[in-house]
């Protein structure tokens, strides 16, 4: 077991923006890495002077913390430049990595900063979290013992992009903390050194003497004896000092013991006689049987003996003596129980006012009865009280008679004058009570009469009020009935108007439904026709292609004709598609117009509810006229469309017939062409291109003339049909207007009468 060496400790007094933040104390692991710890300790104390390379004091005082990374570490120790590029060790420049034994496995560890392997200078860092990735790269040589909150405060400072804190975190002062035990040892060493110096001085004196008397041996022996004597004296003095110390200690102990004894004497002592101490009771809780009866008999005998000693044989017992009482007059009262009488005093005149004749128990009963009577009188409200009071007095009178008899028996010495006075008092009391009862009854009768009168008045008033209320109710009821009748008549009129509107709406809806059905049928027929025409066109194109292939062998002229025919057909189809598109656009516009009319009708209906019935009727007439006109227009348009379709179908039949004739003609031409093939070959050899051009030009002129004629015919037929439809519409409108005029005349008369 080796002696545990005390680890060195250093401190930093830190200021943030020149305001003291606190002290941080470090413990250095000098047993693990002594060289690194010595470097840090000397830089804290500043005892090594200036550096060799930096030429600045090797001291951490007024040094900055130049790098702060939250949740990682706090770095400082660059005393030369203050930005992490400077610093120097006490050994000059850098020194090697000493030991990686201690790991970065916890927070608040003190470790050396470096630029790589074996580049330790003066810069250090304090970890704020475990950093195991630094193990094997940085030497851990200490830890923070106190001041962790100061390190946290430095860590929480705001920094720039280079992790430099905006606030100035500076080490105000630093140094080494020396424990007290070391200080005491150093003082002892100093004392020893001083004593050794004194002894050396004495030795020097003796040596000088010996040098002076070196010639004689006697002087040497004398010096030796002197030194021995001094040692003996020193020993004696030390022994005396020890003895004196022991005596002082003993004297102190004796003084303390004496003071304790005085305190004990001053305290009061309790004196108890041994006779007074009761005997310790026996444990009888385990005894199953009851104790013997002999003891009980002995106790009874002892009690009897004590009573005999207290009461001699001639004297009466104590219980009887206690019962004997003496009155004021000196009479002895004998008997048991409480006293029921007493002797009257000699002076009756005084006693009359002081005390009553009745004994105390009778007085208590009387007071109880009086209380009950008073309370019953207060509680009774209705009816007469005279009978009840008389019954109570009759009940109480025998009690009073008994009282008199008892007093007559017991007080024989009472005089007749006193009896007369008592009778007078009783009579006066009875008369007074009767008078009170009579007064109370009379007052109650008066009150009852007044109440009856008030009730009668209130009843008469209530009857008059009820009559007036009933009249008001009747009048209100009549008014309400009149209002109801009016409202019912108005409601009926309104319902009639609504029914008419509903009928008109239903008619309009039916017409619209029929129109929509017709339109859907027309669209279906159109789509079918379109599909049929497409299929026909495809067949025709296929036939025309096959014909063209046959004709191209020797008939360029016939090919040009077929092309012109196909072009004319395409143009006619385009014209049809245009007309179809126009019809569709017109139908869309018509649908929009119908939707707008529906919206206007909805608004007009909401207005009609507010407006009077006369205006609503006039609006209904206008709407009917508009609906009739629109329906006539639709019918005329539908007729025109049907006619146009019939014409188109006829024209298509004609074209098909003409095409069939042309096919027959082309077949006959094919037979003739075989005979004249030699002549045509010769013509082709002469000028084939010129002949083809001439034939194509002629065909184009003919086809254009035919198309123009067909277009003029179609236009003229459409115009005639439009004129006819317009004339029919005008006739129909005139007829409807006449009908509406006939129908509207009674409605206007009704409005005038209303």
From Swiss-Prot:
The RS domain is required for the interaction with the phosphorylated C-terminal domain of RNA polymerase II. The modification Phosphothreonine is found at residues 358, 748. Its EC number is 5.2.1.8. It catalyses: [protein]-peptidylproline (omega=180) = [protein]-peptidylproline (omega=0). The modification Phosphoserine is found at residues 254, 256-257, 259, 290, 315, 356, 386, 397, 413, 415, 687, 690, 696, 744-745, 753. Residues 292-310, 348-368, 379-449, 463-553, 578-599, 628-686, 707-754 have a biased composition (Basic and acidic residues). Ubiquitous. Its main location: nucleus. It is an enzyme of class 5 (isomerase). There is a cross-link at residues 392, 693 (Glycyl lysine isopeptide (Lys-Gly) (interchain with G-Cter in SUMO2)). This is Peptidyl-prolyl cis-trans isomerase G. Keywords: Isomerase, Isopeptide bond, Nucleus, Phosphoprotein, Rotamase, Ubl conjugation. Residues 194-216 have a biased composition (Low complexity).
